[in-house]
Curated annotation (Swiss-Prot):
<comment type="similarity">
    <text>Belongs to the isocitrate and isopropylmalate dehydrogenases family. LeuB type 1 subfamily.</text>
</comment>
<feature type="binding site">
    <location>
        <position position="227"/>
    </location>
    <ligand>
        <name>substrate</name>
    </ligand>
</feature>
<dbReference type="Pfam" id="PF00180">
    <property type="entry name" value="Iso_dh"/>
</dbReference>
<feature type="binding site">
    <location>
        <position position="99"/>
    </location>
    <ligand>
        <name>substrate</name>
    </ligand>
</feature>
<feature type="binding site">
    <location>
        <position position="138"/>
    </location>
    <ligand>
        <name>substrate</name>
    </ligand>
</feature>
<dbReference type="InterPro" id="IPR004429">
    <property type="entry name" value="Isopropylmalate_DH"/>
</dbReference>
<dbReference type="GO" id="GO:0051287">
    <property type="term" value="F:NAD binding"/>
</dbReference>
<feature type="binding site">
    <location>
        <begin position="78"/>
        <end position="91"/>
    </location>
    <ligand>
        <name>NAD(+)</name>
    </ligand>
</feature>
<keyword id="KW-0432">Leucine biosynthesis</keyword>
<feature type="site" description="Important for catalysis">
    <location>
        <position position="145"/>
    </location>
</feature>
<feature type="binding site">
    <location>
        <position position="251"/>
    </location>
    <ligand>
        <name>Mg(2+)</name>
    </ligand>
</feature>
<dbReference type="InterPro" id="IPR019818">
    <property type="entry name" value="IsoCit/isopropylmalate_DH_CS"/>
</dbReference>
<keyword id="KW-0560">Oxidoreductase</keyword>
<feature type="binding site">
    <location>
        <begin position="285"/>
        <end position="297"/>
    </location>
    <ligand>
        <name>NAD(+)</name>
    </ligand>
</feature>
<feature type="binding site">
    <location>
        <position position="109"/>
    </location>
    <ligand>
        <name>substrate</name>
    </ligand>
</feature>
<keyword id="KW-0100">Branched-chain amino acid biosynthesis</keyword>
<dbReference type="GO" id="GO:0005829">
    <property type="term" value="C:cytosol"/>
</dbReference>
Length: 363
């Protein structure tokens, strides 16, 4: 590849710097194996930025992200900053403004049960044995969380609260295309989640998704009501490939998908805008209780790097190489402490070294 790429690395707080270090080790292996020209710059964010710059999202960090092709984000937050006003705390003061600034409208959350980790799945053993590999595609900027009017009024028995579910055609079209394009890189199936038997917004959602599906004749489309989808995820998650969801339904289903994998330390996420620019981060938190102990699981951060390569740099071969390396490590029984269950565990650094080596070797 001849193009030059630049990644803004925002390690953040807690275990963020430790797991970011491992992801950048793997990036070095990718660079060398695939002859990719990728540079990185580090910027403070979250609590680290509060300590060093007096605010959770300094202008220099935003400017650095603007100059990058993608952002690799660690994690933010911790008890040290909980005394601050909510808007000045690391989570609300950094991550949400970044999403708004870059107009990140789609959230991608993979949820995969890896071979050898079936015992961590809370589902019945016969269901877990089938495995699953799901991508939840959630619309981030529309729907009931942002629709107007919303508020409270009245008093006594007449006091009421209200929210409004609003979706525009363009919002549904663009998130649907993300889902169908993602399915083309996977197993060619989209299941669109709605409540079209009740909600006008869901009726429009279904109509427009059907229209977009005609542009993707190679991708199978199914529709499912949200209540049935929550049950089917427990009954047989292996039936799903890509789940296409509104903001509210995706908020619910992405967490359900995460829970049935059994380990938050394995779950990456991506938030994208219309230009393909993305912010990539682990789905878990900053875990301040284990920070600095070299025991955190870096796989979610490394998988976030794989998503970055696939979606923002269009380097699917490199992303797949990372995923194969992780599969090999897990198949060989290599575990960090969260997955060891009393067996021998490797450190954060050791897991990063192993995955980077497997990428370099082309396993």
């Amino acid at each position: 590849m001849s193009k030059n790429y630049h990644i803004a690395a925002l390690p953040g707080d807690g275990i963020g710097p430790e797991v970011m270090t491992q992801a950048l080790k793997v990036l070095d292996a990718v660079r060398n194996r695939f002859a990719m020209r990728i540079t990185t710059s580090h910027y403070d964010v979250g609590g680290a930025a509060i300590d060093n710059h007096g605010q959770p999202l300094p202008p220099a960090t935003v400017e650095g992200c603007e100059q990058a092709d993608a952002v690799l984000f660690g994690s933010v937050g911790g008890p040290k900053w909980e005394h601050l006003p909510p808007d000045q705390q690391p989570e609300r003061g950094a991550l949400l403004p970044l999403r708004k600034h870059f107009k990140l409208f789609s959230n991608l959350r993979p949820a995969k049960l890896y071979q050898g980790l079936e015992a961590f799945c809370p589902l019945r053993a016969d269901i877990a044995a089938n495995g699953f590999d799901i991508l939840c595609v959630r619309e981030l900027t529309g729907g009931i969380y942002f629709g107007q009017p919303k508020g409270r009024e009245g008093s006594g028995q007449y006091e009421k609260a209200f929210d409004t579910e609003v979706y525009h055609r363009f919002e549904i079209e663009r998130i649907a295309r993300i889902a169908f394009e993602s399915a083309r890189k996977r197993r060619h199936k989209v299941t669109s989640i709605d409540k079209a038997n009740v909600l006008q917004s869901s009726i429009l959602w279904r109509e427009i998704v059907n229209e977009i599906a005609t542009e993707y004749p190679d991708v199978e489309l199914a529709h499912m009501y949200i209540d049935n989808a929550t049950m089917q995820l427990i009954k047989d998650p292996s039936q799903f490939d890509v789940l296409l969801c509104s903001n509210l339904f995706g908020d619910i289903l992405s967490d359900e998908c995460a829970m049935i994998t059994g380990s938050m330390g394995m779950l990456p996420s991506a938030s994208l805008n219309e230009q393909g620019f993305g912010l990539y981060e682990p789905a878990g938190g900053s875990a301040p209780d284990i920070a600095g102990k070299n025991i955190a699981n870096p796989i979610a951060q490394i998988l976030s790097l794989a998503l970055l390569l696939r979606y923002s740099l269009d380097a699917d071969d490199a992303a797949s190489a990372i995923e194969r390396a992780i599969n090999r490590a897990l198949e060989e029984g290599i575990r960090t402490r969260d997955l060891a269950r009393g067996a021998a565990a490797v450190s954060t650094d050791e897991m990063g070294d192993i995955i980077a080596r497997y990428v370099a070797e082309g396993v």
